[in-house]
Amino acid sequence: EIASCLVGSEMCIRDRSYCHAMGILITANHIEMVLVNLGDEIIKKDRIRLKFTAELSYCTEVAQKVKTFLEGELAKDTLLGIGVAIPGIIDQKERIVLKSHALGIENYSLRFLEQALEIPVYFENDANAAMLAEKKQKYPNAIYLSLNHTLGGAFCIDGKLFRGQNQKAGEFGHMILVPGGRKCYCGKSGCADAYCAASVLTQDNRQSLDAFMEKIESGDEKILQTWNEYLDHLAVLISNLRMAYDMDIILGGDVGGVLSDYMIPLGEKVMAYNGFEHDVSYLKNCSYTVSYTHLRAHETRGNLV
């Protein structure tokens, strides 16, 4: 298989549509999959409901979903590898998820999943994968805020992802934003995740983020109040991160993909907490809004080609 991949890599030099990479995002209740060629074109994408469990049967089921997803899409031996993104702290060398509150696992081996997929696999924390894809565009020094169902983060210094001493750098979602505040899924109270994750906007009515944003446009007063409170808390988090790191801040994830029309009111709120700067040009919209999982495939190309 490795030899076949090397042959494929030589073909990629001549034709970037020849070889492919796949990205998988694992969450508590779903897996998202995307297939791209080396020209960065999305060939196929899908989101499937699949509840995560720590049982070996889960790995087998993921492998079967991947096989079904890829059927009829590829010539033999043109898939260079798969990037798997996981909401948790990962020891890449040992192939272990050290801790994932979102999935409810600790010291979980990824080798069973790797064996089930039967192809080179690159594992990464979900926010780290997104940061790596963004910095390849134009942000060698930046923070990435992953505003998804849960809140994550990452940052690069001089083009290199900073992981920290214990692989925990960028866990902005579990910084205390409101002491004694709302209960976070991690067990603490007042975490930024409990105020700035996308789930804050969708949990009350079990609605989609798209439906929530449509209600903002229609002027729904209750929704507008929730949105303004959300932006207030996000502004505090942004201001704190700017003061601590003094670098660009990329707003990514599901909420980051819809914030472009609300950067002015968000910027005004941020400025109210920052007396050292006269603008918020350091706030950036994420480059990728079509498919969050696409970022994993994008990063996989760089690690396997």
What are these model-derived regions, one by one?
Residues I42, I96-V97, L161-F162:
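Hydrophobic "anchor" residues
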Residues E55-L74, A192-Y195, T202-S260, L283-T289:
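Adenine-nucleotide phosphate-binding core of ATP-dependent small-molecule kinases
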Residues I86, L147, A198, G253-D254:
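Short secondary-structure boundary segments
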Residues R14-I43, S146, F155-C156:
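Gly/Thr-rich phosphate-binding beta-strand-loop-beta motif of the actin/hexokinase/Hsp70
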Residues K45-R47, E55, R111, E118-K222:
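Glycine/GP-enriched mid-protein hinge/lid loop-to-helix segment characteristic of carbohydrate kinases
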Residues L266-H278, K284-R296, R301:
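Acidic/histidine-enriched, beta-strand-rich ligand/metal-binding domains
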Residues D46-N141, D261-Y273:
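Glycine-rich phosphate-binding loop and adjoining helix at the ATP-binding site
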Residues E1-G8, I13, H294, G302-V305:
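Single conserved hydrophobic/aromatic residue that forms the stacking wall/gate
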